[in-house]
Structures are given as structure tokens and as C-alpha cells.
Amino acid sequence: MASGNRKVTIQLVDDGAGTGAGGPQLFKGQNYEAIRRACLDSGILFRDPCFPAGPDALGYDKLGPDSEKAKGVEWKRPHEFCAEPQFICEDMSRTDVCQGSLGNCWLLAAAASLTLYPRLLYRVVPPGQGFQDGYAGVFHFQLWQFGRWVDVVVDDKLPVREGKLMFVRSEQRNEFWAPLLEKAYAKLHGSYEVMRGGHMNEAFVDFTGGVGEVLYLRQNTPGVFAALRHALAKESLVGATALSDRGEIRTDEGLVKGHAYSVTGTHKMSLGFTKVRLLRLRNPWGRVEWSGPWSDSCPRWDMLPSEWRDALLVKKEDGEFWMELQDFLTHFNTVQICSLSPEVLGPSPAGGGWHIHIFQGRWVRGFNSGGSQPSAENFWTNPQFRLTLLEPDEEEDDDDEEGPWGGWGAAGARGPARGGRVPKCTVLLSLIQRNRRCLRAKGLTYLTVGFHVFQIPEELLDLWDSPRSRALLPGLLRADRSVFCARRDVSRRCRLPPGHYLVVPSASRVGDEADFTLRIFSERSHTAVEIDDVISADLDALQAPYKPLELELAQLFLELAGEEEELNALQLQTLISIALEPARANTRTPGEIGLRTCEQLVQCFGRGQRLSLHHFQELWGHLMSWQATFDKFDEDASGTMNSCELRLALTAAGFHLNNQLTQSLTSRYRDSRLRVDFERFVGCAARLTCIFRHCCQHLDGGEGVVCLTHKQWSEVATFS
């Protein structure tokens, strides 16, 4: 076994090229200004080669090329069916967004909410665009995608049927910022049809880079009004949904179940001895409004002073209406709130800095997709992130009822923590599935995902620095957890005492594969790191202890080698097959070592394409060591190990690898049954031996730290 006392360590350093000044990433490499200048110089309007105006841009099923809805569709530029098109007529407002025939109310309700805050809107819809001077048929929008902003360029050819826009339109028929934004979103995800069905928080996050939260409503949910009032005051985007199992259904009161509404305002007042709490909502259809109490035509408005009535009530079929809180709780099931990201908000109101950590990861079948049950056999394989909360929140004195997130909705002044309460830290965790909407055309949809939060006791802290501690996970106390649901974004606002925690994001089912982004927010100081290992190898793993060959084995080598006294790969395969025969008789390490693996062994331990007796002696020492390690993890003597255990087996063999490298190895060396046999294990260990020996050439004495750029390491450790 490897002693682990002397090591060679690979330290990865930045390549030095940098990633620019942090500006938006150009989607498909398209630069808006460069395209616009080229089109103006040539006098030819832009046609987008990356998202051609045609059947494929519409969709793949109900909007597919042969579908009924795609018949008669023409792609036209605004000036071809509108006399005086404008990008923006005066100012953008929430009535600019009216839904068309596409079931993307979730996206449009979010866009309508965005118009309430010009500072946010102009980040998504860059100013200075139009159909007059400098018009070249090209527009651009900026959308947040999984940790950074992306600049998306589109041409202005829009789907039109019978002279009218098929999808989103503005109340002002000559205004086109909303249809072009919708097209940019369609391009980002592959087609218009993939936007059918969704949740407002998905669009909220893409428009702001914020964190979406879902509040599930009941008739007696406390603090909803305070939370919504506080959220809108903080420029959060807010939406509400009346759930339905049968699609969009209109109720007798003028609401649409299964439909997304924007929440755009709140108002609290007293009528006599009665407190009235009103919410302003908007249907993105731009029509079909609430007809119950406090609707546009309700006589209750006549009870108000004229100045109140004039300030609040606009009698117009624009989809916007007021309703009382109790009616809201009766008819709506969920509220979706998007808290803005530190980048958008800037410094916190208290003057301190915002703290955010972003991690990119992936669940891989047979490696780290261990399911959602902490007691399950493979749960420990899931990605893990260590979170340390250092400073508790300051206590808030509520001036209203307790908010639904433990006072989150309160707007009172901050004060010192009151006696008897355990100080706690507020941390917002956000888990996002990456790029799943783009895969709808292939029949894939969102996985059921979520996360657990476990507390790490002080006595185990020193052990929790590498994946070797994963076996301790089942014994930890769970401090919190999110819901597990089939949404792109799953978030939870946690209130935890200062201390050390383990965040474990997972898919619900073992073996589900997806890319994910985990974000951790707090106003107070915290640290967060992925549980990972430093890439290193014990020198004992690279230098097998000298042990003379058995006479019979040495004689067999010489017989096969002939006069040259060296073996090629085919001869080595024969020799190993004969030598391992006793092991196969005991059903340990069954099967043959293939020719390709033998070629790899010759390359690693020999010179050129040949293997001398001395080299074979070294190779045989490694093979015996690897066989002992393999047998330890082949507990049922089946000749295979679970691919999830490959990392543990490699660690036992003296190789300590980070998550990315282990994932690459697992994907390469597992079979279709997620098993690793002895030959695959030998090939993997030989490859690692070769890599680390190559790195040791840069060291005096073969021990110490080798610094490589990511590009250099990629060249050395390519597993394709």
C-alpha cells in the first residue's frame, strides 16, 4: 500500500490569457456593433445565419414545419407590415407586453414586471436601438445565463400570419422591443416552441441574474402582504400563479387558472374601522381581468376620496386590476419573487459588501449522481460544498406581521439581537439546471432536483477537507433542505446558526445526469468551497518496491522474448494471461488483459514499443499492487467494482485526484453497466502513472510541487 508520506503534487495556475473585463459573453460569437457596421457599409439588412427565419426557428412539434399552426406563416421585418415601426414608443411600460398564441405567459409576465424598473430593463434592452438612423435590421439584448451575462443578436424578421404578429405584441401596434426580446430568448434556447410552459422565476432570473424564490400560499399564510410590499420596495420582481391540472381555464371571476400574472403594486388603507390591503396584478394577455371586489367596475371605488381613486384606478381593458389580499389568497397558489443579485443591486443598504459564491457542476451517472435520499447507498457520491457562516444577522424589529420567511418581509429598523434568541445567519441557496430547456426538442425536460444542508460538528472539521470524508455524510445532522421539484430553479432562504455546513445538491433519482449551477448569497460574511482534492500521487504509487521475479515467470518472459530479450504488446498479453491464470481460477480479476491495454503498459513502462526484463519486473510489481487494491473493492468477487468506487480505489492505490479529473476517468473507464473490471482499472492506473511520471521530470528528486497552466495540464491529462 502507498504510504502517502512523499508526494508529487500538481498545482494548476491561470493561463494568463484572462477573460476580459467581465463584459457580456457574445452568444454564438456575434458582435452587434461589428454586424451593424458591416451591414450599413454594404447596404444589406442583416439576416441571422445562426437563427434563420424559417420553420426550424418556430419549433419542432406543435409549431413544427408540418404542423397546422406553422401553415401560412411569413417572416417579415416590421417596416414590411407596419407603417412607422418604433423600437420604443416614448417609455417602455407594463402594457407594452401582450401575449400572442404562444403559451409563454411566464416569460411575458416577467417582462411586464421588468418594465417597472427602467434601470433593470435597460440592462436587458440596451438603449440606442431603433428603425431610423443607423437601422441595419439587427438588434441585440442581454440575458443572464448561469453566472454571466450573454449578448444575443437577432435580425428583425418576425413570424407573421395574416399581417399580424403570431406571438407577443405591444398595446401600441407599432412598438417592437417586446417581440424582438422574445425572439432573442427563442434564439438562446433553440426555438419559439421551447418557450411553451414555464415558471416566472426562470425568466425573472434570466432578466436580472437574481435569485428566484417560491412561496406556496394557503388561506392563512401569514405575512404575505408584508413580504410582497417589501419585495416590490426592494425592486424585486414578483409574480403569482393560479395552478391548474387542466391547462388554462377561465373562472367566473375573470381569472385564468394555470396562468402567470405579474404583481406590480400594493396599497394599504383604512375604510372606517377596516384595514384594506390591495394587490395590483396584470394579465400578460392585456385583457381578461378580475371581476370581483375592487375590480375596475366595482362600486367600492366610489367609497374612496377622489384623489385616492384617481391615483389607483385606471378603467381600461389592459389586463391590469386590483384585488384584496384575502381574495388573492383564495385564488392563487404560488407567489414567485426574484431578489436582485448583488451585481444589480450594488452595495447593500447597510453599506457592507454582498457575498456570493457561484459553482458550476454536473451530475454524472455512475460517478456523482447519488439520488436525494441521505440514507441511500450512493448518496455520499453527490457533489458537496462546505459552507461556513461567520456573522449572524442583526435582529429586525417588525412594524407589521411576521413575514412568511421568518420576518423577511418586515420593513422595520435593524436593532440588536434580543435576549433569549439564538443568533442566526440568513443565506440564500439557489440551484439551477443548466441548458435543459434547449433539450426539449430531444424529448428531455427538467429533472426533479433539490439540495440538503447538513451541519458539520466541530470535531469533524479537520476531516472534512477532501472527498475521503464522504463516508461520514450519513452520520451528519440535517439542518435544512429545499423542496425537490422539476423546475429549472430551486431556491431556499435558510436561517442557520453560525457554524460549518455541507450543501449537497442532487437529482431526485440515482443516475440522472444534468449540468447545474449552485449559488450562495448572504449579506453577512461567509465562505464556501467545493469539497475537492488536490491532484497528487504518493511516490510509492509511482515507484513499485523492488521484488525479484519468480524464476518460472522470468523464464517464461525469456522464452517469449527470444533473442531480442524484449517483449512487444502482443507477447506481453500472452505472458500476463498465463501469469494471472491462478487469480482467474479464484474468480478474482477474471478475464483477459486486452491488447490495447498491453500497448498502453508497454508505452508507460518500456522504451519505444518494447519491454525489457527489467521493465517487466517493474510493471509486474505495479500489477500485483493494483490487483491487491482492486480485490479490496471487489467485495463480491465478481471481477468488477462499482464505478462510484473508482475514486476510492485510486486513492487507495496512491492517486489523489480532483473532481473534474475523476469524472473524466470514470466516464472513460466504466462500462455500460456502470462497472469497472480489472483490465479497465489497470488501464486507468497505468495512465495516471504515466502522467505523474511525466510531471516528475520537472522536479529535483522527483518530489514536490509541479505548477502547470490549465492548458498544459489538459495536454498532459487528455483522456479522449
From Swiss-Prot:
Annotated PROSITE patterns: CALPAIN_CAT (PS50203), EF_HAND_1 (PS00018), EF_HAND_2 (PS50222), THIOL_PROTEASE_CYS (PS00139)
Acidic residues bias locations: 393-403
Enzyme Commission no: 3.4.22.-
Keyword Ribosomal protein: no
Residues that hold Ca(2+) according to the record: D634, D636, S638, T640, E645
Annotated catalytic residues: C105, H259, N283
Covalent S-S links between cysteines: none
PANTHER family attached to this UniProt entry: CALPAIN, CALPAIN-12
Protein name: Calpain-12
Native organism: Mus musculus (Mouse)
Gene: Capn12
